[in-house]
Amino acid sequence: MDIFVANPLLALFVIMAVGLAIGQVKIRGFSLGVAAVLFAGVGFAAVEPDIHIPHLVYILGLSIFVYSIGLESGHAFFALFKSQGVKQNALAITALALITGISIALFSLIHLNGVTAAGLFTGAVTNTPAMAAVVDSLPSIFGDANKVHEVESLPLVAYSLAYPIGVLGVIAAIGLCAKWFRIDHVQEAHDAGVAVEDLFTRQIKVNHVVTGSDLVIDIHHTLGLEIIVSRIERDGQQTLPTASSRIHMGDVLSVVGTAEELDKAAHVLGDLLPGDPFHGHDLDYRRIFVSNQDLVGIPLAKLRPRLSGILITRVRRGDHDHVATPETVLQLGDRVRVVAAHDRMKSVTALFGDSYRRLSDFNLFPLVAGLALGLLVGMIEVPLPGGAALSLGSAGGPLVVALVLGAVGRSGRFVWQVPYGANLALRQLGITLFLAAIGTTAGASFRASLSDPASLTIIAVGAIITLTLAIFVLVVGYKVMKIPYGQTAGMLAGIQTHPAVLSYVSAMTKNDLPALGYTSVYPLAMIAKIIAAQVVLFALT
């Protein structure tokens, strides 16, 4: 182990590699995933306590991790507030406030010191940024550097002991409650309109008078369906719909949507026609990769003048296709299905970019500038009685700034978003760096705790906190607030801010309801837990 003591950088990457390898091991369908890196770091440092990874590494990793999450979630987070977001976040904040109060009462009952209690709390709610905020707050409480060094391993040890039950307990609660409530995930997704279905293009002949707006671009609002008209055939000539195009009797519309939505549209408009919508016509379609920064971060409705003679019908982001609407905002790395004349396809392709190489050369300035701004926001302190100070820290600051910038999308020439693939890579790298570095600070103390009977008390109290939070959210969300169970379970995963729980729920439901719930509460839950952990620390220290 001497080689790792003398070479911290080597130790860092070996810990990361070992942890990621262990994280891929599945036992009955469950794996620790990237969280295994934390335990790898603890294990290495338990064997050789002199292994030290520089403090800056975990700060850097944590900041990158939360910033990339905020950028990806920002637009959806603020959009959801216009519909269900307020109700869902009210449940999340109520649950976290309740569990914070219960935790403080439990910790006081067993006479647990504030530093260990705060670490236990962050492990029970599985939030590493909150644990980092606790460590960051220690100097404002103890002042003396030697005292800080003496106690800084305590929250990490308590976190490590409570963390496994924090994950497994929530997963068990979700699975058991699903059986208890007899949830039909297929029917639930269908009722909520989020069943994962393929998109098709079909021809519909207009034989009925359209009630409401007869503008083609308004058809999804007029009919209340997630569809888009990609072409209009009139008197044997096919054209692309424009902002002023209207639906006439006898028109043949090429419509994109799910099979069910297309059947509903045909019932209202007229008759569904057989055949290939593209056969024998001058219009063509193609999937094109978005790498032109000038087109991202702007709703399609505002891009329409630049897209004259072009129609975007579908947007594929990650592994899912979405019907393009006027409100859709493109991101770098999206794959769009466009319809245009044959002879324009070359220029259309050039307009969108269609270049993986160009995408890899994205401007780093907005990324580092946003991170710098986030760290500055995280440094803002709110004084508390007794001389302590509350702050968002290196996790909360970047997250708040990223949420705002992710919702804004772009400022003039600067595109705040990063390509989807790059975002996922940054997120994975950031959390891996953080967990590897933070794990090594607790090794010696963790080894000693394994032979300490008090560790069982920490694990038991952590389990009580985890299960109380899980059952409260599932019962109140599903039974009282009538939120679909899959979405409620996704909200619980978001409140726990743990991707492993989301993966489990998504695999169980096989639809997008968990992702909707997760995205709606994750950012606010992250910030709330960063603050709650410090409240526990200050209340009991």
From Swiss-Prot:
Keyword Transmembrane recorded: yes
Transmembrane regions: 4-23, 30-47, 57-79, 91-113, 156-178, 362-384, 389-411, 424-446, 456-478, 516-538
Residues covered by the RCK C-terminal domain: 187-271, 273-354
Superkingdom, taxonomy of origin: Bacteria
Biological process terms in GO annotation: potassium ion transport
Subcellular location(s) per record: Cell membrane
Alphabetized Pfam families for the sequence: Asp-Al_Ex, TrkA_C
Family per similarity comment: Belongs to the AAE transporter (TC 2.A.81) family.
Name of the protein in question: Uncharacterized transporter DIP0830
